[in-house]
Amino acid sequence: DDGIQGRRAHFHNTYCTICTVTPDEAYGLGMNFAKKLNCATAPVSFFIPMRGWSAYDIEKPDIKKGWAGPGAGPSWIPSEKNPRWSFRAERFTEGFLGNLKKDNQNIQVYQVDLHINDPDFNELMYCDLRDMLKGKWHKGKYEAGNKIKRIF
């Protein structure tokens, strides 16, 4: 369905219509997030879920992540480089890394091969925040595994 300004829209119910950002807007969001994080004076971990950003931005049905199908979520756009990844996540990452100051030692960025609604993605962020609050945070702690890649 046509949504606002040509966006894909999913009419969830009478009261809720889901419209997602375009890939170009995702790039702009990445730029803006980077500019804000460039000022960080305390530890910052930034996790980018590469397999989708919402229940409707998903490659295939998964009721536990919020999309029962049929088929891919209504706002899913696969990456040409890696079809299992969201094109929006890829564009966000490009805008983000292109504007992030590489000399700020307080920032670490992870590209995570998981969906935002994946319990493992949420556990990763929880553990990182817990470590920050307990004073046990250090850069690169969560690089283990094939789903997580520290890109900065």
Predicted features, each with a name:
Residues 1-14, 57-61:
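Redox- and metal-dependent alpha/beta enzyme cores, enriched for Fe-S-associated oxidoreductases
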Residues 16-152:
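Metallocofactor- and cofactor-centric catalytic cores in central/energy metabolism, strongly enriched
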